Amino acid sequence: MPPDIEAIAEQVFIALADPTRRSILAALASGGPATATDLADRLPITRQAIAKHLFLLAEVGLVTAEPGERRRVRYRLRSAPMQVAQQFLAALARDWDTRLDALQVHLGR
């Protein structure tokens, strides 16, 4: 597996390990682009905490910040990093399937 895929997948998994960030991503997925204030209205989290998490999600590439009206920044989901993480997991699954198939052959099943 190319090292860049592993590095991107690692960053995505680190970001997804936090339940607050998963909630933010779920809110963006269901409600579309939103500001930190919009997300604070929907989630039981302060706007400041949401802004901190959005900054990390943007660094990883899971969200993108778009300038909006009156200097308000709207955040939108990006699927590319998730697709890389899915590729990483699919490669692991293929490796395990190959090993399990070999074990079944070895055991005579």
Residue ranges and their predicted role:
Residues 1-8, 30, 83-109:
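Amphipathic alpha-helical dimerization/coiled-coil segments
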Residues 2, 7-46, 69-83:
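N-terminal helix-turn-helix DNA-binding core of bacterial DNA-binding proteins
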Residues 14, 26, 58, 64, ...:
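A cross-family signal for key residues in well-ordered alpha-helices
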Residues 19, 59-61, 81, 94, ...:
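A generic structural signal for solvent-exposed, polar alpha-helical segments
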Residues 20, 32, 58-61, 107:
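Short amphipathic alpha-helical segments enriched in hydrophobics
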Residues 54-55:
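Short, hydrophobic-biased segments on the C-terminal half of alpha helices
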Residues 58-69, 76:
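Beta-hairpin "wing" of winged helix-turn-helix
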